[in-house]
């Protein structure tokens, strides 16, 4: 993992991120405290008014709620936004940084959806892709809360797997890194 530092990105000072290459780049950022706090507060304060996102997501998770959807209205989901402009601007700035870091130019960006997966014991998300209305797109995970324990590891306890995020790569070959299980902390993105 390499650490890079940029001076400014759309008023984001000292943008720090980690980098892993899995056939495509995976960048790991730390969310500013004000953005992190805003998302958590909005989720908790509006929980009863948030649209369930379970019908359109693959996760085997009871509590999946949408904070933002800006796509075509569907039977499963209609356009809505509970997030203030500074939060959606943060997402867009990070996605634009990702594209610039990878030297991807002339790529139109559209923020399609933001939701919360509130996972409990025995719930999981199978391997899947995110693509919105297109076959290409950027996907992200932000850590808003973590439990005090992920439970007992029933096998290979020296290699912790419970509650881990696993990102699968698009590379092959003898020395290729094919997956990444980042250590997760609050505010990781």
Residue positions per predicted region:
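Generic internal hydrophobic packing segments that stabilize the cores of diverse globular domains
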Residues: 84, 88, 92, 113-116, ...
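Non-heme Fe(II)/2-oxoglutarate
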Residues: 11-106, 122-126
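Catalytic core of non-heme Fe(II) oxygenases with the double-stranded beta-helix
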Residues: 117-189
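Non-catalytic cap/lid and distal C-terminal segments of serine-dependent acyl enzymes
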Residues: 14-17, 29, 115, 183-185, ...
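A short coil-to-beta-strand element that immediately follows conserved catalytic motifs
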Residues: 104-114
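Residues at beta-strand starts and edge strands
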Residues: 23-25, 110-112, 136-138
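Generic preference for hydrophobic/aromatic residues in regular secondary structure cores
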Residues: 2, 22-28, 33, 116, ...
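N-terminal amphipathic/basic-hydrophobic helices that include classical n-h-c signal peptides
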Residues: 1-11
